From Swiss-Prot:
Gene Ontology cellular-component annotations: cytosol
Protein's recorded name: UPF0434 protein Rsph17029_0141
The family this protein is said to belong to: Belongs to the UPF0434 family.
Annotated Gene3D superfamilies: 2.20.25.10
Pfam families: Trm112p
Alphabetized InterPro entries for the sequence: Trm112-like (IPR005651)
Length: 59
């Protein structure tokens, strides 16, 4: 949780990796969406996933 805002896990059904179009995994501890195929972790800030490759962390 960041502040008082939680990520809505139902969003995972609609979101895909912008690089591979594959599904994403949610890492609640790090507040990231993980693309295993692209080996990228997209941050979640204030409950909003930031799906920009330039903002992603390499795994």
């Amino acid at each position: 949780m960041i502040g008082n805002t939680l990520f809505d896990r139902r969003m995972l059904e609609a979101l895909v990796c912008p690089v591979t179009q594959a599904g994403l995994a949610y890492d609640a501890d790090r507040q990231e969406l993980i693309s295993k195929q692209a080996r990228l972790a997209f941050p979640i800030r204030d409950g909003i996933p930031i799906m920009l490759v330039s903002e992603a962390r390499e795994l």
